[in-house]
Amino acid sequence: MGAVRVPLPVRVLPQIAERAWFTPPRPSARARARDALALEGVEPITLTVDGRPRPGFVTGEGPLMVVAHGWGGRAAQMLDLARSAARRGYRAVAIDSPGHNTDDKSTSDGFQMAAGLEAVVASFGPPAGVIAHSLGAIATVMAFRDRPPDVAVWLAPVLDVRESLEIFSHRAKLAPWTARSLKRRVERFIGDWWPALTAGPDADLPGAEILIVHDPADPDSGFDRSAALADRRAKTRLVEAPETGHNLLLRDPNVIDSVERFLDEARVVTNHPGP
């Protein structure tokens, strides 16, 4: 929300704040036009998620790489990273999550984002790897914790919903009682998944080789949690991406190079055939 004027009901009425929390931002018409140009010549797909058609794309041949956008994102944002995976011998698949981009359903949540990833696997088979941005990292934990891929790339990952709630409450200028009520409502909604979605440095895809790429000054997700995870967990690498913020790293050439090097090195470790 940033400097946008926040309507008073959002700030003081918990039920309105809750609706705002579960409503991802939509891309501008200009962004959608850029997406359409970028996707020209890329193989389109449409998958059904909870009875709703969700568009996306597939590129490359080889083991499946599931590509997950973040909150308020869309598949087209991840095209450069999907192509990097394709160059390294993977079949990269991404779709727009439910409630995102052009979907006429206005709300979404981590469960729906995870359902989108599960739909990819249902159509294309088990994943060898995942590439995920922001809240997409938590969605990969929800979708694949019990059947983790061999490799995972997390870009500016959101690893603790509590941090996101704090950022949202601050930017929306929620009244203190509204912020407290919103947290209780979100915790109740998440239910048994609350420990996993607030794990922070203890977040995990068991056994996977993980690369984390993060701007130390990212205003939307805490670099300190990524650093602590990399320090704690074996088979985890952290690459700092200064001055890329929360979204620019998705197209940053240095980030793309880091991802490709990681996929090459991880392929040797996990004994997947090369491209």
Locations of regions flagged by a protein language model:
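Alpha/beta-hydrolase active-site loop
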Residues: 106-128
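Catalytic histidine-centered segment of alpha/beta-hydrolase-like enzymes
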Residues: 244-254
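Hydrolase active-site cap/lid region
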Residues: 146-190
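Short beta-strand/loop motif that positions the catalytic acidic residue
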Residues: 205-207, 212-214, 218
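Conserved alpha/beta-hydrolase "acid-adjacent" motif
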Residues: 219-225
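Gly/Ala-rich beta-loop-alpha elbow adjacent to hydrolase catalytic centers
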Residues: 131-140
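An N-terminal hydrophobic leader/cap segment in hydrolases
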Residues: 1-48
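Conserved alpha/beta-hydrolase
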Residues: 75, 82-104
